[in-house]
């Protein structure tokens, strides 16, 4: 029988599969060009947990761009010499913090240290301020860090509050590298043991003793012949060295070839060499020469691979390339002919799994190589699967119509979509002054004039703008291949939903296909059973999920019904709870009087809208601003992640059981600094109609409702855990079918992604292990296979996945019937049945009938 840790696998694996984000660890460092000689950044300091070595966890603090997940090291800031850097810094820690730069120029008001007699320049918890630096005459590799000596802030350096600051010479880089890496030298103290590290990874010395399964520490990859640059920064109070196996470089200070360099505390150094030059491909160890430091983890592996060298694209500020690190910088206006966006999947690994064309030969995501999709994938995820139709009818129509007569031809073949398009702003981009003003902005962006369509013309946003002009190479419009060219602001705002963690709209398809039971259905020949999931979770790179084809109406997308097709049902009854709340009743009885043509930021509550809508509330980002995403203020998220504020007695108390995969690598913290900021924005929004006192009470009431519901879930989880430990559930895990996709879980994810303990359990049991509780225990609702899961497990899944979430939505949206009868009452009933069933199972186990 499995031990208790095995019984807790469900919660651990939940976040592993549904929220795993594959990222490349080596740096693609882009130069920030900014505007008018200045780069404007918004940065934050937040807590996080890092895993320097598998199974070793460190409570860190990290910097990040606004809304991003914090990292150690923080974001690389690379600018051209002479650029002004202005950073709006928000401190989301519980201790003071700052940003202090090395090397560049700044005033005493921007030093980031609380020196007596100078203006205060550290930032209290929850506060913000602007730091300004001048890089004129200061080229080089520097770094920035927190510089606080009071109220706990002095731990900033040891906790990870540092990042690289690179100033490129004013004349540019005459020999730019193909690959560029930043390496911080540091040590993390965990329970009294020092784990020496490059960046945030500490290698296992067993790798140096021939154990290929040992953790390699930090890894860097390059192709044979790549010009490689390493920026070394010693962020500790100890001296370190950096030694490269097989590679050497010219040290400019002595004009000699060397392969080892020493760095004093808080020193930096830059080295350049050619990958594999004279030594070939392979895995090369780079390490600190100090035996103690290397033995305790300060090494990494430089992987040189065969392959064609890619010319340098990363070092020069002259290129003006778009960078994700400076949202406000200029970029060249896209044109519809040449636009190739990178909003949805900027990372090459994600592109390969979700966007690179595969037709209908293979699926999507981490399991994509192991199933072939149903034909409807051509519409569910068109950027990867769309196949133009092959039909003799098209050939016959060409006799009657020219290839560019899209409207005339489709008026005969699909008149409905043409009629929709003719009513749209796409066909009538200058139908009134308001639309004309927006059209003028788009015309300037794309370099084309857009006039109202007239019969016989190709005016307006014609079919070819969104589908291409070649019918043989027809494509479906997505954010990346068309929408983002004319609507880059909306596209960028929409994609920001990813920054707040899953679930979110941009990654809805990823969440769908990454669940193990999804691909398992396909392997059983039952892929069509997942169509219900596919229709809501279809790739939202297509804007028509909210703006229906072919009107693409903003007014339609502002109405709450636009959300109802997906946001309904037992696990998220948003529509049921909103439409039957007092808000929904007011909306239903007065909606024809509302002004749907106004942008949300222009709406006057009580005049244009007589009650709130989904969009008005959830797209609000604070300070009287609305954006094209709904994730900004999510505190409880979907509602299935255990909160830190509840003292759990079941295995939920140990969540997340050592698995540390951002962003879902910890319990929710309902009263963290970040959550308090979200709460402030909610109260700010609600105060447009209610008193701030009432709004605060309502949010507090929702929190307490959820805490009480989680305590009932905790009791149910504990009951089932004990049943498994008592071997009272039949058939036991080892005698029933394994967890879905168990044979691939080990193969595809491996020890590095599963974690050492989970990897061992799956390998030891071949997937014959109990999986219960949030969130992978939801497989109980999606599948049933010869006793796996059992009835009591199904009952528990319905408790936390249906009853709990129904109550959550009812309480949040002020619908009393759903809050109580669909939520609390149902959850209590689930718990009662679980208690009764547990007693029956124990009696069966003991062989007693006890009156039955």
From Swiss-Prot:
Q: Which Pfam families match?
A: Cu-oxidase_2 (PF07731), Cu-oxidase_3 (PF07732), Multi-haem_cyto (PF13447)
Where is heme 1 bound in this sequence? 406, 409-410, 471
| Residues at which heme 4 binds | 537
Positions bound to heme 7: 614, 617-618, 813
Under InterPro entries, the record lists: Cu-oxidase-like_N, Cu-oxidase_C, Cu-oxidase_fam, Cu_oxidase_CS, Cupredoxin, Multihaem_cyt_sf
The molecular function terms of the Gene Ontology recorded here are:
copper ion binding; oxidoreductase activity
Database matches in Gene3D superfamilies: Cupredoxins - blue copper proteins, Hydroxylamine Oxidoreductase, Chain A, domain 1, Hydroxylamine Oxidoreductase, Chain A, domain 2
Binding site residues for heme 2: 463, 466-467, 550
> Which terms in the GO cellular component ontology are assigned?
encapsulin nanocompartment
Cofactor binding: number and manner = Binds 8 heme groups per subunit.
Region of interest: Hydroxylamine oxidoreductase domain: 328-827
Record's keyword annotation contains Chaperone:
no
Query: Which residues does UniProt call coiled coil?
Result: none
Broadest EC class assigned to this enzyme: oxidoreductase
Looking at the record's lineage, which domain of life comes first? Bacteria
So what EC number does this one have?
1.7.2.1, 1.7.2.6
Location of the Plastocyanin-like domain: 72-169, 217-307
**Catalysed reaction equations from the record:** hydroxylamine + 4 Fe(III)-[cytochrome c] + H2O = 4 Fe(II)-[cytochrome c] + nitrite + 5 H(+); nitric oxide + Fe(III)-[cytochrome c] + H2O = Fe(II)-[cytochrome c] + nitrite + 2 H(+)
The record lists Cu cation 2 as bound by 145
The UniProt record gives the binding positions of heme 5 as: 543, 546-547
Where is the protein situated, by its record's location annotation?
A: Encapsulin nanocompartment
Q: Extract the ranges annotated as region (Nitrite reductase domain).
A: 28-327
User: What is the protein's known function?
Assistant: A nitrite reductase-hydroxylamine oxidoreductase protein that probably functions in the type 1 encapsulin nanocompartment. Probably involved in reductive catalysis. Targeted to the encapsulin nanocompartment by association with the diheme domain of the encapsulin shell protein (AC Q1Q6L7). Catalyzes the reduction of nitrite to nitric oxide (NO). Catalyzes the oxidation of hydroxylamine to nitrite.
**Miscellaneous comment as given in the Swiss-Prot or TrEMBL entry:** In the construct expressed anaerobically in E.coli contains only the nitrite reductase domain (residues 28-327).
Family recorded in the similarity comment: In the N-terminal section; belongs to the multicopper oxidase family.
What name does the UniProt record give this protein?
A: Probable nitrite reductase-hydroxylamine oxidoreductase fusion protein
The root-end lineage is:
Bacteria, Pseudomonadati, Planctomycetota, Candidatus Brocadiia, Candidatus Brocadiales
